[in-house]
Structures are given as C-alpha cells and as structure tokens.
Amino acid sequence: MSKKENKKYRIGMIGLGTMGCNLLLNIADHGFSGAGYDKNADKVSMLDQLGRGKNLKGFTDINTFIKNLESPRALMMLVPAGKIVDDVIADLIPLLDKGDIIIDGGNSHFIDTERRSTALEKIGFHFFGMGISGGEEGARTGPSMMPGGDKEAYKDVQHIFEAISAKVNDEPCVTYIGPGASGHFVKMVHNGIEYALMQLIAETYEILKKGLRLDNDAVHNIFDQWNKGRLQSFLIEITAEILSFKNADTDHLLLDDIRDEAKSKGTGKWTSQVAMDLNLPIPVIDIAVSMRDLSKYKSLRTKAANIYDGVQGGPLTEKPDEYLINLEQAYSFSMVTTYAQGMHLLYKASETYNYNLELDQIAKIWRGGCIIRSTFLEDIYSAFQANEKLEHLFLDRSVQSILKNSLQGIRTVVADAATYGLAIPAYAASLNYFDAFRSERMPSNLIQAQRDFFGAHTYELIGKDGVFHSEWNSNVKT
C-alpha cells in the first residue's frame, strides 16, 4: 500500500441498513473515522443522528462520499448478495483510483466473489470478501469476521477489524482466512451449520412439547439449564429467551402465535449444493434445508394431517425428568455431528480450492460474536490445534468420548420418536450418518452391481486392479 494522504474518513461503508450502520458506529467507538453512503436519505439521516458526537458522516451523493475518504481508499459494501453487488462495483470503478480497496461484507456466493476478485485485480483494484456473523447486535458490539482474498489489502485494514471484532480471552474473533473466495466460503459453511443447529433445537422443542407434553415454562427452564452447562451456545441461549417472551397484546407466549413457515436467504442451500459438488456428505445440514422448504407447504401439510390423523406424539415416557438425560445426550451427539460435518466440508474445500485453511483458527474466531458460538468450539479448536492435519472430528479422542457417552441417548430418542410419529429428521440424520461413517463395509457394493447391470457402468473388485463389467442376465429386460 502506498503512503496515505491526510484525508478525513478512514473507511467508507456503502449500504446503511442495520448491519452497515451498526458496523460504522462500532468502528467510530474504537477511534476510527468513517463515512457512510446510501441512496436512501432517511438511512443517512439515521446514521448522522446515531453517530452524533462521533467521527462519522453520512452521504447521499456517491461522488462526495468517495472524495471524503483517505487514500488509498478502503470501502466496504454491505448490500444484498447478487446483481446489486456487481452494480455497486460498476458504479465505483470510474470514481476510484488504482490501489483502492473494495470489501464485500455481505453474504455473497463464493463463486461470485472469486469472479469479482479476478476481474478487479486485473484492472488494478484490491478486493476481498469478508463473511460477517453476529447479526445486528454483533455488528454493533463485536462480530466474528472471516476475511479472505487479497492479503495485502486485508493487512491495510486489519487493525480496524481486530479492534471492532468480538473478543474471547482478549483474542479478536477475526483472522485472515485464505486466498480467493475463502472468506465467503467459510461464512457459507458457518451458515449451513447454523441451519442444522436451529433445526435440531426446533426438533428438541417438538420433543419437549409433543413428546413429553411439557408446558412452555418447563421447556424454557430446560433450555435455560442447558445453556449453563456443556451445551451452552448462543442459539440455546436465545431459545430460552424466546420461550419466556410474552405477546404484549395477548399476554401469552409470542412463540405460540408465530406461523410455522420458516424462511431463508439461501446460504444453507448453497452449502448443501457445494457439498454435493464435492461429493462430501453433510446430511444434517441437508435435512435442515429440506425441512425449511417443507414448512412452506402449510396447506398440503394441513390436508395430510386431516387424512393421516396428524401427529399425536406421545407421551414418550411417564418419567419426563429421567428422559431428559436421553434428550440432552441426543442433542450433544447431534450438535457434535453437525459441527463435524461442517468442518469436514471446510477440510475438503481447502484441498480442492487450495485455500490452505487453518481449521483451528476458524474454530477460534467462531468462539465469540457469531451465531454458532458455543462452548464446544473450544473442543474443536483444541482438536485441530493438536492435529492440524485432522481430516474429521470423529477421529479426535475427546470427540470420540462425547459421541460414545451420548450414543444411548440418541438411539433412544430417535427410536421413540419414530414409534410415536414425531418427525425429528435432523436427529435421525445425525445417528444414521454416524452409523454409516463407522461401517467398514457399506452395502454400496450392491449399488455398483446394479449400476453395471442396467447401465454397464462397471465395478471394481476387492484385491484386483482395473474395472470390470458382467453380462448379468441377458433375459432380464429393463
């Protein structure tokens, strides 16, 4: 980077929605000056109002905004993923100088980030994509951030992001992830893990309500208690809070009034699609995506409930207090499996795309600020610290201990739910993945024989090199 000129604002933010505005306020709180741009005058006014007394300034004119940034300029975009990112970049290029830095802080698809990085580098601009997790509160008080791409560009603003990030043991929850689109890839997988954990918690809620017939206060107390122990996590914490939040209009639980149709922005789907492209199984994440899709078919589900008598669900036991031991084990088992699948995908992507990911450092920056932060991330960090070449968390000794100690609980819960007609597909996917993973010989030999039978796709033999084909039965017609 060249020597900076003495201009007013150190960093610029394009897009002053909740995330962009809160990040700028966070930046100002840590002693850095910032400028914000948005076409919406109300959002600019809001920034100026909230930033009163801070070294912040909002602009509705992009030319004036650009002129008021230090050089070389550092600009972050926080706009919706897709075409709008390309449109903003196209608007910026004529106004910037070579050597300026553009940062995409949104949830862009990593393939798009790779394309943009290559194109901007060719014309002399620095660019990197940075995944940001923590929601609006994290943006304001300290998010977890995953920057990947132009390393020299990141170094120029590294001190800013380290200052504004969440801290765990006084260590910043941000680190340079790797080259290319690695930052956005890691954020995508983070979101896939998030989908799966949310689905597991929803299924836990289903078991507690329909399977154990507990009231809302009891369910709240269980999640609150879990959050004080080894299952502590941000998502468990907010679930406990949700289960005590009353509707101001009716004075009963707001959760009971919310429609059971879950929306999404697509990052979970992207994770599943990429994993399939890499031939790597992440079934807990996959089923979490599918269940959100199924939730949208409310009218069909209502018709089916009338035909098939709906879900009775239980009671699974006459001793719910004792049964909670099984459920806690089941959640622990499935949570570990979810993280293991996500980390395995990162391992595979690192090899495939030459990202050179340091999985211990990724686990480290996920310990604070982000949506999937949990006590278990300390175990993940330790596992990859002990063995940087660890391919799968199931091979780590401490993780093995958790899985073995939780196995009875997950088997009991999945079996009982199936018996009583409770849908807990993420729990079931966790158990089935584990059982298949530990199978030295799977029944896939039959699939290969079938493929060769109807399509002459060939097969391989144990102890012999090469591929083979058989004329299985010339009398069978397909």
Please place each PLM-identified region on the residue numbering.
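Rossmann-fold dinucleotide-binding core
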Residues: I11, D86-V88, I103, H109-N221, ...
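C-terminal amphipathic alpha-helical interaction region
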Residues: T412-V413, A417-T478
